């Protein structure tokens, strides 16, 4: 059995891999960052979501129903390239009170439970 100091150091060396394996990542929806500090775990999630568009307002316009507008038209003279819909960033901050020392204390507790 390794001394406690070597177990402690090996846990911190593998912290990046083991902590990321425990976390659930939503790669398609956004970016998740996490940091652990003693008994606190911080998670930051940034998600790019589409805004509610003004389609209902455009459909109810007189031009949509076939009326000819009166007066000058201030629209574009040439066809524009299609663009992506308007989006907004949604931030979610989660702070959890817990221990990130699970890798250290699991093995000694397992030995105690076998006796």
Swiss-Prot record:
Any single Gene Ontology cellular-component annotation: membrane
Membrane-spanning ranges: 39-59, 93-113
Record localization: Membrane
Question: Which protein are we looking at?
Answer: Putative uncharacterized membrane protein YEL053W-A
Signal peptide range in chain numbering? 1-24
Misc. comment: Partially overlaps RPL12A.
Query: How does the protein associate with the membrane?
Result: Multi-pass membrane protein
UniProt keyword annotations, A-Z: Membrane, Signal, Transmembrane, Transmembrane helix
């Amino acid at each position: 059995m390794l001394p406690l100091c070597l177990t402690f150091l090996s846990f911190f060396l593998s912290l990046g891999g083991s902590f990321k394996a425990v976390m659930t990542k939503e790669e398609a929806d956004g970016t998740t960052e996490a940091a652990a500090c003693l008994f606190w775990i911080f998670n930051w999630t940034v998600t790019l979501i589409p805004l509610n568009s003004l389609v209902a307002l455009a459909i109810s316009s007189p031009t949509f129903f076939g009326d000819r507008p009166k007066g000058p038209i201030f629209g574009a003279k040439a066809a524009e390239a299609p663009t992506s819909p308007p989006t907004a960033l949604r931030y979610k901050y989660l702070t959890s009170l817990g221990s990130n020392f699970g890798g250290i204390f699991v093995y000694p507790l397992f030995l105690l439970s076998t006796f």
